Amino acid sequence: MVDTAQIKHVASPLARQTLLDGELTHPVAGGRPIRMLPWLQVVKIGGRSIMDRGRDAILPLVDELRNLLPEHRLLILTGAGIRARHVYSVGLDLGLPVGSLAPLAASEAGQNGHILAFLLAPEGVSYLEHPTIANQLAIHLSATRAVVGSAFPPYHHHEFPTSRIPTHRADTGAFLLADALGAAGLTIVEDVDGVYSTDPNGSGGKQAQLLRETSAADLAKFKGTLPLDRALVEIMLTARHIERVQVVNGLVPGRLTAALRGEHVGTIIRTGARPA
């Protein structure tokens, strides 16, 4: 028999409550989480927009990242690009579920990350897999100024079955990671100057106007083409730390540098995070 008189009970405000009742959990969970890496700058590099363009787009950006290392500690995340779209096409033709397509696309983003890490290897930059970023990022960034990883979130077989194409892709993954770590900021590097009123490469491109500043709430109502994942817009509304994201043109030398120095050189998107 177990002597139950010796069992210690831990007083916990959540122990006897349902975690589904917001009114009960808010007094405990409503506080602002700590910032684990408040000095970190997260940079997401587009797969289709940058990496697929080859050396003419990649090498100047690598030089810019190299020059930024003395100023910032960076987590550089890469998207998948056109190869993921081909994988989607083949997978859909074979009838694969969305949860099987997600890790296949993520592997393509990882390949782009390895390419970028190889080019920055002389500066001590290496590629880290998801578990290492989750558990050992701080110690790696104490040894070097930057690391590279895949921007795809590791939903994989847990991907939401709301669409035949994975909805949580590279932009979404970069934001989730930056917000969870309490990073100083997130900059998304694309091949356009920011978010436009209409697709600048579409039939009505001549009428497209650059939105210098907007909000996730406004973009949620936006019906046009976005250079970002739609799921990212939804997640921005519930952000805890990242108050704004800047989308910049990585094909223009110096834009990324200016953005990381706090300059307004693209589209700034305000999230739902409250100022500290």
Where are these regions (language model features)?
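C-terminal catalytic "cap/lid" subdomain
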Residues: 2-276
